[in-house]
C-alpha cells in the first residue's frame, strides 16, 4: 500500500520516483546537518562499471551531482519540482565526459585526489523483476544484492522494484565511517519524510523535518 501511494503521488503530480527519493534523502541530510539548505547527492543515470564502458556507445555520463538549495519555507511539492527542474536541465548535458565532471567537481570543491565532495549516491531501477514469457511465468524469481566488500562510495543506495510491486532498498556503505544503524536511521526518516510529504504536500520542508 505504501509503495502504491508513492507511485500514485508521482503519477498525479507528474514526478519521477527518482526525484521523490532524492527529496527524501536530501531532507534527511538537511535535518541531521542543522537545517543545511545546500545539499548535493550524486544521482546515477547510466550504470557503467569500467572506464572503457564509460565511453562505449557514446560518452553519456554515469552520474551527475544533484545540487539543490531548498529553504525550510518551501512546501514539499514545490521542493520536488525544484529537484525535477534541476534534473531536467542537467539531462540536456548528459553526454558530458564523466571524467570532465569529476575534474570540475574536484576544482570547485578543492577535494583531495581520489576523494569526492558528495557522500550519498542514488540509483533507481524502475524495472520490476517479472517474467513476461508465458512459458516461464510459473517460475518464481528471487534476486538479492550482495556487497563484494569494495565500497567505493561512502553511502550508495540502490532502489529497485520487487515482483509483487514492492520496493527494495539496498545500501552499500564504507564501514570505516558508517554502520548498519546509520542505514536504518536513513531509511526510517526517509520513509517518514516521504509519507508525510505526500499526505500533506503543502506542508513546508521545515515543518516536516520538525515533525519527523
Regions found by a protein language model. Give the residues of each.
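DNA breakage-rejoining catalytic core of tyrosine-based enzymes
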Residues: 1-4
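Active-site catalytic microenvironments for nucleophilic, acid-base chemistry
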Residues: 27-32, 67, 193-196
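Active-site loop/short helix in cyclic nucleotide turnover domains
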Residues: 7
Amino acid at each position: 500500500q505504501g509503495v502504491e501511494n508513492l507511485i500514485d503521488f508521482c503519477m498525479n503530480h507528474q514526478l519521477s520516483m527518482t526525484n521523490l527519493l532524492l527529496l527524501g534523502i536530501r531532507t534527511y541530510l538537511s535535518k541531521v546537518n542543522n537545517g543545511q539548505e545546500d545539499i548535493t547527492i550524486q544521482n546515477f543515470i547510466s550504470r557503467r562499471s569500467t572506464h572503457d564502458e564509460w565511453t562505449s556507445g557514446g560518452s553519456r555520463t554515469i552520474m551527475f551531482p544533484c545540487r539543490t538549495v531548498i529553504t525550510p519555507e518551501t512546501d514539499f511539492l514545490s521542493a520536488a519540482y525544484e529537484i525535477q527542474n534541476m534534473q531536467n536541465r542537467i539531462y540536456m548535458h548528459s553526454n558530458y565526459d564523466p571524467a570532465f565532471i569529476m575534474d570540475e567537481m574536484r576544482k570547485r570543491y578543492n577535494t583531495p585526489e581520489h576523494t569526492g565532495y558528495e557522500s550519498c549516491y542514488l540509483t533507481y531501477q524502475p524495472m520490476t523483476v517479472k517474467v513476461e514469457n508465458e512459458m516461464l511465468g510459473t517460475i518464481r524469481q528471487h534476486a538479492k544484492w550482495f556487497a563484494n566488500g569494495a565500497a567505493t562510495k561512502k553511502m550508495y543506495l540502490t532502489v529497485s522494484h520487487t515482483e509483487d510491486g514492492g520496493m527494495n532498498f539496498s545500501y552499500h556503505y564504507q564501514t570505516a565511517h558508517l554502520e548498519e544503524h546509520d542505514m536504518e536511521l536513513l531509511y526510517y526518516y526517509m520513509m517518514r519524510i516521504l509519507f508525510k510529504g505526500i499526505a500533506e504536500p503543502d506542508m513546508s520542508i521545515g515543518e516536516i523535518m520538525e515533525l519527523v
